[in-house]
Structure formats: C-alpha cells, structure tokens
C-alpha cells in the first residue's frame, strides 16, 4: 500500500506537470473505485486549472481554480504517473487528466481500492480527513506529544503509531523500521513507553520517513513514483520482509509474527 513517503514522492513528481496548466480533457474509464466517481467531473473539469498540490496523510489534495479540491487516494495498489498522450492505457488505467501542454496524468489501480473525489468545502473538514492526527514531519509531532498521547494506552506500540488518529503516514514498513532503530519492542504497551523512549521514537520516525521520501518511496509491490520510476528505500530496510534472517546489529534471527493482521518483524535481543 502506498504510504506517506510514496504519496509525497508522487506529489512532488507530478506537481510541475499539472499545476497552472489548463485541463483539456478528463477520461473516466472505470468509475467504480472505493467510492463511485462523479461522472460530471469529465464535463466540468476541462477548462479549469489546478493551482496547488498538497498532501494530508495519504491523501493528495489538488486545488482547482474554481474553489473545489480534488481528493485523491491511491488505495492499496494505485499510482499516478505523467505519460505521453500516445501511450495507450492499460487494463487498470482508470482515469486520465490531459493538460494543455499535451501530457497526461494517468491513474493506475489494479485493485480499485483508491478514491477520486471532489469537494467544494474546506478539505480539512472532509469526513475522510478531519479525524487525522498530526503530520509526522511537522513540529506538531514530537516526543512530548507521543508521551502525552500514550499515557494509559494498553495498545501495542506498533499498532498505536500506525493509528492515523495518533499520527498520519506511519505505515507497516515504516513502523517496523522505526521501532527497530529506536530499540523498542513492537508489542510493548504504548502507555509503558518512557519519556526518553517517546522522544527517541518520534525523532526516528521523522528520520525514517524523510529518508524514504528522499529516496523515492519503496519498491514494494506496485508502487512507482510520478515519473514512472520505482523507489529505492526497500534496498535499505533493516527488518521488514526479513523475518528469520540475521539481525543487522546482533546477527540473531529476526522474529516475524502477525500483529493486528500486519506482518511484524523485530529482534528479540535488540528490542527487548
């Protein structure tokens, strides 16, 4: 599933190609994604211009010059790429936005769990967005915030930091990696984290996500950046996907087990 670094990589990749260039055509090949796409968008978006590309959690927010905002979620397997108009659409290429310069923003989603919505209201108040926690790369997310929020929480810390109401964008890959680097056992109750541990974890989450963004997201499964190129962060994973292999620090076998229906990999020696 594309997480925060993948979505941010996509935003940065497509923004120069889609902002301040009039939309000339919208093609909706399949309108049944996670929620039905408003077919009227194929009629009322052409002639409009996108003026800003933001991100909130895993949602792309594309501001239209008429006050609307397009809310785009990549779902489990989606990607947005800039392609030439001569490139024929594939089986899972569901949406095309063509711009005056001739190039096309193409949405690819084999599993159709993504979303393409429009709102005339403040997107921050949209039902999909209003409950989200702070962005992890902002000053609002820090060790003191984690410490205060975690008090009396019995939830396993890995599940807790993956809760988008606590902080957005810490998906399974990044939760595994961050907890390993912070030397925190993923099954430890969040409420038992010390203040220093919370500060350490917050700093490491920021560093892991920032590094992944710099390297273009991960290469896992279907993700490619807005330029169609894969990311390279997967080449630097310490624990995720390496259950049973030697720990990169102590060489003891890494433990792998399910937690909240997600694969969890950790070192029982380093993360005790």
Swiss-Prot record:
Annotated protein name in UniProt: Formamidopyrimidine-DNA glycosylase
Catalytic reaction annotation: Hydrolysis of DNA containing ring-opened 7-methylguanine residues, releasing 2,6-diamino-4-hydroxy-5-(N-methyl)formamidopyrimidine; 2'-deoxyribonucleotide-(2'-deoxyribose 5'-phosphate)-2'-deoxyribonucleotide-DNA = a 3'-end 2'-deoxyribonucleotide-(2,3-dehydro-2,3-deoxyribose 5'-phosphate)-DNA + a 5'-end 5'-phospho-2'-deoxyribonucleoside-DNA + H(+)
Cofactor(s) this protein cannot do without: Zn(2+)
E.C. numbers: 3.2.2.23, 4.2.99.18
Cofactor remark from the record: Binds 1 zinc ion per subunit.
Family: Belongs to the FPG family.
UniProt entry tagged with the keyword Protein biosynthesis: no
Function in brief: Involved in base excision repair of DNA damaged by oxidation or by mutagenic agents. Acts as a DNA glycosylase that recognizes and removes damaged bases. Has a preference for oxidized purines, such as 7,8-dihydro-8-oxoguanine (8-oxoG). Has AP (apurinic/apyrimidinic) lyase activity and introduces nicks in the DNA strand. Cleaves the DNA backbone by beta-delta elimination to generate a single-strand break at the site of the removed base with both 3'- and 5'-phosphates.
First and last residues of each zinc finger (FPG-type): 238-272
Residue numbers binding DNA: 92, 111, 153
InterPro entries, alphabetized: DNA_glyclase/AP_lyase_DNA-bd, DNA_glyclase_Znf_dom_DNA_BS, Formamido-pyr_DNA_Glyclase, FPG_cat, MutM-like_N-ter, Ribosomal_uS13-like_H2TH, Znf_DNA_glyclase/AP_lyase, Znf_FPG/IleRS
A GO molecular-function annotation: zinc ion binding
SMART domains associated with the record: Fapy_DNA_glyco (SM00898), H2TH (SM01232)
Keyword Transferase: no
Active site: 2-3, 58, 262
Keywords attached to this entry: DNA damage, DNA repair, DNA-binding, Glycosidase, Hydrolase, Lyase, Metal-binding, Multifunctional enzyme, Zinc, Zinc-finger
Assembly: Monomer.
One of the GO biological process terms: base-excision repair
Upper classification of the organism: Bacteria, Pseudomonadati, Pseudomonadota, Gammaproteobacteria, Cellvibrionales
